[in-house]
């Protein structure tokens, strides 16, 4: 059956809006799309396997070397070992779409570094808006990539992509203004309902291991050991360390 959170988002999907009390509308849009095609749990979760397939495709596209065709089996084994990613292949949560559009953003940024053509600008702009429509945490993804390459601030094509993302995100910004920014106030000030305990940090560290699945030793060792060869690698390092430290503290 559906977990509690999925039932909560099903309730969102009954009345589509440009925003909800504690979330942007992406998850509600996806659930609404599914339940208009199928009834029950199948409809609620319909988008999840398609997003999972997109995740696998985008990860494959992010691998540059031609050697990947020789080790397709290893790639599939590695992807299948990431438990949380597999779970998002059938559960519909805000993080389900956030993962997909985060990968799209990373792919678009990589392409943007190689060639700043119209496609790169459009996809980069769209993906920035999409991650923000999934969760407000999407700003971390955009922010840490920007911090890794401040020269983007002098790039007119990057500002074009930013303008596109803002235009696409305007309906939600207007909605936020209309509700006096209640979701932001909730996340920033009202959500914490208990004093800090060391258990919170320990649980977070355990979750960091669980998220990586069975390959966590290899994944974290490679992340720490491999040097940054270019701006894209540097962005990945900033994302990894930045997100980890942000939620740690």
Question: Predicted segment positions?
Answer:
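Transmembrane-helix motifs of polytopic, lipid-linked glycan transferases
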Residues: 46-68, 104-108
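Specific aromatic-rich, kink-prone transmembrane helix
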Residues: 58, 78, 97-114, 120-128
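Membrane-interface transmembrane helices that cradle and orient dolichyl/undecaprenyl
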Residues: 64-69, 105-121, 222-228
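Transmembrane-lumen/periplasm boundary regions of multi-pass, lipid-linked membrane glycan transferases
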Residues: 141-233
């Amino acid at each position: 059956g559906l977990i509690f959170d999925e039932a909560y988002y099903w309730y969102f999907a009954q009345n589509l809006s440009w925003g909800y009390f504690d979330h942007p509308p992406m998850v509600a849009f996806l659930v609404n799309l599914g339940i208009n095609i199928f009834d029950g749990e199948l409809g609620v979760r319909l988008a999840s396997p398609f997003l999972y397939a997109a995740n696998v495709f985008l990860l494959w596209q992010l691998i540059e070397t031609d050697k990947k065709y020789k080790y397709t089996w290893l790639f599939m084994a590695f992807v299948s070992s990431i438990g949380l990613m597999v779970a998002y292949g059938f559960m519909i949560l805000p993080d389900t779409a956030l993962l997909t559009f985060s990968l799209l953003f990373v792919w678009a940024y990589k392409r943007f570094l190689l060639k700043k053509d119209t496609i790169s600008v459009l996809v980069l702009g769209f993906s920035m808006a999409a991650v923000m429509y999934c969760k407000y945490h999407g700003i971390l993804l955009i922010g840490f990539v920007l911090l890794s390459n401040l020269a983007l601030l002098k790039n007119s094509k990057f500002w074009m992509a930013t303008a596109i993302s803002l235009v696409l995100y305007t309906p939600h910004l207007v909605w936020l203004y209309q509700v006096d920014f209640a979701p932001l106030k909730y996340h920033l000030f009202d959500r914490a309902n208990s004093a800090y305990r060391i258990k919170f940090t320990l649980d977070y560290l355990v979750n960091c291991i669980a998220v990586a699945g069975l390959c966590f030793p290899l994944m974290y060792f490679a992340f720490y050991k491999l040097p940054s060869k270019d701006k894209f690698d540097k962005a990945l390092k900033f994302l990894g360390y930045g997100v980890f430290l942000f939620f740690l503290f």
